């Protein structure tokens, strides 16, 4: 059962409500996020490279994201498919999160990304981002699919469960 690719130094113990469904919360973060941070390894220097991406999920809950093929992160992923994607959703209207941005849910998936030309994936991405239809249909853009290999979720001191990739599959 794979958890984080980068194990925590100190194991995190779940805090707060024992009935809280952290797996469902993780799936919600991924599904509701419209953008995310993408970490790749620069193909020329080997240094980490971080950028923003537009995200959605397909019908199976797999992460999809759009990039311009001339962007640095696209070049990097063609050279080394290993990536990390960090999702965060705005929960500032929740009483427990008000004025505490680090209490809000954030989740990092580590894995490998590949360009998908599956018609269903493209349809699912465009359903979430209708205004990007023209960009997607141009040759200079691609939709990528993430094959996750590790997951790490933090939501401040109230919640930091150990999750596995298997937890992200909905029943």
Label the model's feature ranges.
Residues 53, 118, 163-165:
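Residue-level recognition of conserved structural "scaffold" positions that shape functional pockets
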Residues 1-23, 128, 132-171:
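C-terminal edge-of-domain segments
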């Amino acid at each position: 059962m794979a958890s984080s690719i980068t194990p925590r130094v100190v194991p995190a113990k779940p805090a707060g409500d024992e009935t809280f469904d952290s797996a469902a919360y993780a799936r919600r973060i991924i599904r509701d996020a419209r953008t995310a941070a993408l970490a790749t390894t620069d193909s020329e220097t080997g240094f980490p490279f971080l950028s923003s991406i537009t995200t959605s999920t397909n019908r199976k809950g797999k992460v999809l994201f759009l990039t311009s093929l001339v962007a640095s992160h696209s070049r990097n992923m063609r050279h080394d498919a290993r990536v990390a994607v960090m999702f965060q959703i705005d929960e500032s209207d929740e009483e427990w999160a008000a004025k505490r941005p680090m209490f809000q849910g954030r989740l990092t998936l580590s894995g490998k990304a590949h360009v998908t030309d599956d018609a269903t994936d493209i349809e699912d991405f465009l359903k979430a981002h209708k205004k990007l239809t023209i960009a997607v249909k141009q040759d200079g853009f691609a939709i990528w699919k993430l094959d996750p290999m590790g997951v790490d979720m933090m939501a401040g001191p109230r919640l930091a469960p150990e999750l596995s990739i298997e937890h992200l599959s909905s029943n």
